[in-house]
């Protein structure tokens, strides 16, 4: 992501109620001193994390790939309005009841799968993906065999070719893979 776009995102997020920015770079995910709830949620999704005093320092020292925004009280969907004009080169997507992802419009899971398929001569119809939230839309669209988890977002369920019989908490992906 462009450094100025990331800085603009940080400035905006600091003004949004219930919002905490997680700046995701090639080296680490960066967050300011989190309370227990935020720490738990960041640790659930990010293996490498660094606590910083100011997120702007992370922008100077790492290649940032996305900015994730965590909302207390599951306010992500109603907070999307704050990010409508986040930047002409950026996309904003609901990635969970408490999460929004901001990234370059030209990047994403779908483009990554397309690049891998092209590199290894895998046909679109032969590619398989699983998703549960709106940040997985391009991923599922890029694969001929697309699965939404049973507990996934309704919009994603309507897009996917299949819906799993079990949730991701019930190992729904493994159940599908065992039955292939």
Regions found by a protein language model. Give the residues of each.
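Catalytic cores of large soluble enzymes that bind and process phosphate-bearing ligands
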Residues: 1, 71, 165
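Glycine/small-residue-rich loop that forms an oxyanion/phosphate-binding "nest" at active or ligand-binding sites
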Residues: 1-7
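Intrinsic-disorder/low-complexity regions
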Residues: 4, 60-61, 178
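Conserved acidic, metal-coordinating active-site core of Asp-based
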Residues: 8, 12-130, 136-137
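Mg2+-dependent phosphoryl-transfer enzymes with acidic/Ser/Thr/Gly-rich catalytic loops
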Residues: 101-180
């Amino acid at each position: 992501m462009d450094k100025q776009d990331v800085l603009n995102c940080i400035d905006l997020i600091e003004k949004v109620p219930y919002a905490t920015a997680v700046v995701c770079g090639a080296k680490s995910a960066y967050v300011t001193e989190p309370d227990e709830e935020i720490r738990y949620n960041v640790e659930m999704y990010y293996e490498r994390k660094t606590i910083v005093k100011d997120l702007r320092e992370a922008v100077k020292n790492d290649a940032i790939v996305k900015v994730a925004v965590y909302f207390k009280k599951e306010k992500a969907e109603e907070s999307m309005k704050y990010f409508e004009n986040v930047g002409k080169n950026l996309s904003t997507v609901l990635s969970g009841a408490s999460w929004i992802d901001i990234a370059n419009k030209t990047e994403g899971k779908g483009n990554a799968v397309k690049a891998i398929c092209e590199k290894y001569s895998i046909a679109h119809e032969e590619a398989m993906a699983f998703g549960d939230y709106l940040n997985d839309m391009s991923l599922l669209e890029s694969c001929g065999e697309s699965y939404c988890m049973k507990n996934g977002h309704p919009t994603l369920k309507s897009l996917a070719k299949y819906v799993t019989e079990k949730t991701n908490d019930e190992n729904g992906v493994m159940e599908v893979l065992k039955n292939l």
